[in-house]
Amino acid sequence: MSARLLLLAALAAAPAGQNVVWKAGFGREAVWNDGQAEVSVYEATDPREGRLRISRAIFVVVAEDLVAGRLVKADDPAHAKTRRVLKFNHVRSIPTGLYRYEQMLSVFADVDGLSPLKITMTSHEWCGNSFVEWRSDTNTLSLRSYWEAPGDVDAPLDPHGALFYDALALVLRGLDFEKTRTGRLRVIDSIFGSKPAVPQVEDAVIGVERTAAPPGVYRVHLSRGDQRDTFEFETGFPHRLARWDRSDGGTLKLQNSVRTRYWEKTSPGDERILATPGTR
């Protein structure tokens, strides 16, 4: 039996929590405190309007300070009570004929344990706008949409230790890939889309594949019923996401990654910083 089939069999039989090990302190490593952001470019495919669309995705990971009582970025962290977070932005611009889906999801994850403190999502195309916010201080999910369904909804959502699907590309980087084998988790379905809905919380099985994975990556399988995601993370720290085969049929493949103060790169020609394949 192949190593992949053996892993899938182990996933099916995995008891809760077995050998799912997280590395303490991932969010406090020195790389996140160098005053720069990690900006990664992915070649992306996404199912939209009955076709697979080709685009690029941008991931941004950067350390920030949130005002503790409000969960907004502190203008002056030195004079405010703050929470240190890793902010993960997932930015999309997906073409569909005449118009594009312009979308961005932000996860604000506490540096200790990478648990999200807040998640926001915006999506717009020529039909209208949608906005989502989840907050850990109220455990409330707020949806605002142009569409009748979902329309305007405020719903309770307490993760109770479940992982947000939309945060996995960041949170799974905190795994101890050498010690993790297989185990069961709970996953909160995606809210990233033009018609977001109150998500379901599903049982999931996770497993790490090392020996059969391509050189230089750890392969992580996540199964939720008949939905399967496969992530490939670089073996070297900080374990950037190299590839993601998603359960909806979409894919992300890493093309370029740099550390930079992107908020200062506003001059004509600065776009070339992301044009050269490779990692820096």
Please tell me what each predicted stretch does.
Residues 8, 154, 185-188:
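Intrinsically disordered, low-complexity regions
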